[in-house]
From Swiss-Prot:
This is Sulfite reductase, assimilatory-type. Keywords: 4Fe-4S, Amino-acid biosynthesis, Cysteine biosynthesis, Heme, Iron, Iron-sulfur, Metal-binding, NADP, Oxidoreductase. Siroheme binds at C135. This enzyme catalyzes the 6-electron reduction of sulfite to sulfide. This is one of several activities required for the biosynthesis of L-cysteine from sulfate. [4Fe-4S] cluster binds at C91, C97, C131, C135.
Amino acid sequence: MSDEPKGAILQRDKLTYAIVPRTPCGLLTPDVLDAVSRVCRKYEVPIIKITSGQRLALVGMKKEAVEPMWEELRLDVGRAVELCVHYVQACPGTAVCRFGLQDSLGIGVAIEEEYVGHDFPAKVKFGISGCPFCCGESYLRDVGLVGTKKGWTLIVGGNSGGHPRIGDVLAEELSTDEAKGLIRKFMEFYRDNSGKRLRVSKFVEKTGIEAIRQAVLG
């Protein structure tokens, strides 16, 4: 049984750790910021980094600091290595952006709440954009949504890693409820038919977007 602290990632020096608090869609509150500031000062955290997934990485702590830091932060763990949904990134959408056409933050938070804690064959990342400017990088995420005047466009199979892939459009002009429902069907299809550690992009390539459409749209 591993004696590594829970919710921590060993760093390259093999001595220090990083933790990633869960911050749905990059949303923070003054209380969360106060807690992070207080804890990082107390435990002398040398690096505080905003990640590409709209999360905070607290980096460089000794092993013995990890558990008390989590206790004092009182935040959930943002999963970063497990086979599950890692994050949902979202642009501001209609909440504040003058270009927003759909409520990207609203649907993004709902998606994260639905899938947090659920296991999948590989890590999964969502990108939600409230307009076609696509600031949520929707075409480069495992599952993406892009808002238009006529509703949501659902994209699957994107990847921004070492072998980048533009995702395939699964459906267009979806209402918010339709988008969430179709994502649910796709995630179930992926979970039940993918091999372990096969990312969504590879799964879509292997299966074919037409076969996926027949399976989840029929």
